[in-house]
């Protein structure tokens, strides 16, 4: 980071000497000469604080002489010196002033320079999205054909932001792009600086061998030179190499690289950069048990970071202090430091506008919440009467699925007293449009893109943000409490008891898996208990065994026996400690970590070894707070006018002739139809060899159409297309059902999705792969989404966020609940399950969770489908209470006439019966 920014500043520092001219206006000659002398002196002063003060004196003289060039250069220089002191608010202020000053001089190249500087400033402040915005604006100003140096700086800046925000895979792509640009520019020093940054990014990706190779090559180059900049470059190489060795527990090697650096950084860079290296050295002392020495280093670093307003580093070092005190059993001190760290962390998270940044950030900082919960529970063990188990539960809620919580807020329309409802809806719509464009910008960074693409997105974003500011301003005028009303808060135990488990038949089980210990909270309407579970590693190992056996698509008696044994062992781990508490009819499960991959309905009851589904209705939720938000959103919706919108049996190149030639071709195609609704993520999803017809989806949709009745949308064949999906008004429908192939990429969830028609009626290729980003962009405020495809309930497991995948995407799009699968589901078995599920919902009037349980019990009692592989894979996430509200059909004149005729006939029959009874009694 030091060299990335200093490299930019070094290239700018000569601008004063090279461009400032002698003025002919005699009235201002003396003033300008004094200003020039002071400004020249500021460049000679090594102390950045002193240099900034001298430059401010020069700035005052330039302003009095109305010297626009001197003013612009002074603003720029002062901003640079504040950055060198890690004074980010001041650096931002002066860089913005410099940007305006260069704009007044119509100097496009210098404007690009300042935008790049501002990108680095925002990155250091932790406002990564603003950093990307500045880099994007700079890219829009430069000539891509000629200015490879500037392109390299921009790509390097985006790499820095990606690395800092927890997206090193994006950082690697951008670093490689920057290195290529510097190579084209034939700038050897910058080329090797970027080689160093690639080494650092490889370290973040835990590719330690590749990291050391790149860092050593860069170090060899810098040590071959003999100048001040090269010494700093070499020092940063040593810093990164020290981090690599520390990560591999090679502490002696790490210290060899790290110990000489702080003194050099204090002389040549900044106290903040020196403090960061010292904090890393402190971690080595902590690992070696020298806790007092480590604590002293952390305390000194914390003061530096707080003074520099470096929130990211400050939160990290306070966490380190809390962790250290926790290891010494100083629980009060540990709680204080950890609480401070989490408060700063929450402030940073609140400023993140991107779900990708928020999710990545959550994964990076999850251990802070884990340590805090562990600390509270250790205190609870010592004094159970304090009620710290409640505080620990609320910390667990704070730690999980926060990016989804923020996104759900974006989909909700709040009723604010005194505010125009149309204005509220306009603000909500603009906020979601901004979110969509932001995600598109971040996603674009991860691949090859053209300047025009980023330019268009940035222009649109600027317009949307300006519109949003105006609307928010009006809302604030109408209600000063608007800012507080629109914020999301996590649920307390009392709120959970009042609005989530409000009856005696419901219990919430919230799991938290930790390195030192795991916990489960069992919350009923009038009670809360917490139970200690084995460590995360122990649970993870057993989960892997159970999941592999459950997802086996060819179960037999031997695999079923091994599955039963492993499932009993897992049940003993995660349910055994609370077996006596499982006396409710409904269990809401908030899973954590590997437990997200297990259908709890299959786990055996610790009391009698029967699957939980035999006795309990199982509901899943990302968190209790999100379940409450989903419920609130659903309550605000008007009644639906239609029941079902279903998409399935799409057209692929491989089954095109089937749809053109009719039923006979369909019968032939059925013989080569795959058994599972899954596409291998390594394959090309538009390749005919990987996208084959699923014969049972056609039968499934026919059955659903019969059950749902007239007025439903059943989009099959060529109608099962992207265009129909994106243009359907889902607010009219209660259920969205998708029956097709699913595609899962657990490492890159944005590449997961499902397939609709890949060709049109003329056999022209079309975009039929619906990605997770497409799902996020949908407006889908339905009561229920059913993803009748393979592994649609899975995604990337990110600590603190859970599974990032299609289920999350549809909840953001507006769905109150989602039914999805955890493994490659069998085509025929899924069709059968869906038949019973929909009959239970729409004909028997059961709520979705109850209907799913009944359908799964029906299948498991059928000898053909009794293996859990066939029935246990589907789970329900989200709202569970209410049945699907069927629309009341409008009564036509003809139907009213029939009803009157029938009613009249019944009335005559009733009167005749009364008369006959009276006559019989009289006759008797």
Question: What does each model-identified segment do?
Answer:
Residues 332-613, 632-670, 685, 891-924:
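Amphipathic alpha-helical protein-protein interaction segments
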Residues 135, 456-459, 463, 593-596, ...:
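A domain-level signal for caspase-like cysteine endopeptidase catalytic cores
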Residues 36-37, 73, 113, 153, ...:
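Residue register of alpha-helical TPR repeats
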Residues 488-495, 557-565, 569, 684-751, ...:
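Functional beta-strand-loop-alpha-helix junction segments that form "active/interaction loops"
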Residues 744, 749-753, 758-780, 825-924:
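Caspase-like cysteine protease fold
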Residues 598-621, 663-664, 743-777, 792-799:
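A short, glycine/acidic-enriched catalytic loop
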Residues 62, 82, 102, 122, ...:
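Eukaryotic all-alpha helical interaction scaffolds
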